[in-house]
Amino acid sequence: MSGMSFLATDTKGDLYRNYGRITKEDYHYNVAVIDLRNPTQSDGNNLLHLVNKYMDAYKENPDDISLKARAEKYAKIIAKTLIYGDGDASAYGQNAFFYDSAEGLMTSVILLIAEFAEPKERHIVSVFKLIQELMAPSNVKGKNHFQLLLDRLPMDHKARWFAGAALSAGEQAMASVMSTALSRLNSFFGYGDGTGVVL
């Protein structure tokens, strides 16, 4: 890459059409298009890219725990960004427990997807779908499918640690935490005006 990163607004597409190739080929910039009016025409971006990258590197080098720590760091950043989209965690007042727990739950699910899902399924939509599926009531009294899934992991698995507050909550509180996570993901995916992520 050449020089500093920058963002240029281009409402008509003239900048990209006239200078995109030059910027790419002559100045070696990575040029990406984000079209909010027509998201399917945008360049793709996998929010879980860095989590997946470091999780894969850790799987190849299991002795280097710094790689797994990086995957966990990026999973936490993604979850925090999606849960606290406006950046102000203090604004949630009495509901702070649910938002904090939803952040931990989402971090946990992101790590599970990065570690165990098939490569083509390792993206944010899979996080949404997995949380939705795991919300279903189970045949075990007092536990939903998410809790049963995490029970299958070793006690020292970080996915269990991140989900700790949610795992220790009662049935109703756990359902609220999962609903909060789904709600925040849902608001990220679509805004009702065509500017959201296409599922």
Spans of features found by a protein language model:
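P-loop NTPase motor domains
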Residues: 1-199
